[in-house]
Curated annotation (Swiss-Prot):
Descriptive protein name: Transcriptional regulator MraZ
Species of provenance: Desulfitobacterium hafniense (strain Y51)
Domain SpoVT-AbrB: 5-47, 76-119
GO cellular component: cytoplasm; nucleoid
Superkingdom, taxonomy of origin: Bacteria
Subunit relationships: Forms oligomers.
GO biological process: negative regulation of DNA-templated transcription initiation
InterPro entries: MraZ (IPR003444), MraZ_C (IPR035644), MraZ_dom (IPR020603), MraZ_N (IPR035642), MraZ_sf (IPR038619), SpoVT-AbrB_dom (IPR007159), SpoVT-AbrB_sf (IPR037914)
Primary site of residence: cytoplasm
């Protein structure tokens, strides 16, 4: 399981250090793709395969499903850790997530999210305001 928040710098070649706490759970190879809210989603291969099967089962005749699957998979790339524990983020993913220098890696249960520091700060402020009402809504779901 992934949890926590870590600030790291992206170097001039587009490489980002993956926190040691995330490395073992991610494994040597994993998948990064365009996430929601202009962050990147990073999945261990086993989690990716489960998600891939669910997305493959969506009806391609439905425009929303087709658009989501197309966008999600078009940004997907297999990543490997180098000997220094870094990943190379492709330019298209860095551009999508507005990643320039400072990145925040966030553990979200079954995945890691990579955010630009500025977008994460904005998102966190907004999420903090909605946190209490979201908690109240989750009570209705038995959580």
């Amino acid at each position: 399981m992934f949890m926590g928040e870590y600030l790291h710098t992206i170097d001039g070649k587009g490489r980002l250090i993956v926190p040691a706490r995330f490395r073992e759970a991610l494994g040597e190879r994993f998948i990064a793709t365009k996430g929601l809210d202009h962050c990147l989603f990073v999945y261990p291969l086993d989690e990716w395969k489960v998600l891939e099967e669910k997305l493959r089962a969506l009806p391609f005749t439905q425009p929303e499903a087709r658009a989501f699957v197309r966008f999600f998979f078009s940004g997907a790339t297999e990543c490997e850790l180098d000997k220094q524990g870094r990943i190379l983020l492709p330019a298209n993913l860095r551009e999508y997530a507005q990643l320039d220098k400072d990145a925040v890696l966030v553990g979200v249960s079954s995945r890691v999210e990579i955010w630009s520091q500025a977008l994460w700060a904005d998102y966190s402020r907004q999420a903090e305001d909605a946190y209490a009402s979201a908690a109240e809504s989750l009570v209705n779901l038995g959580i």
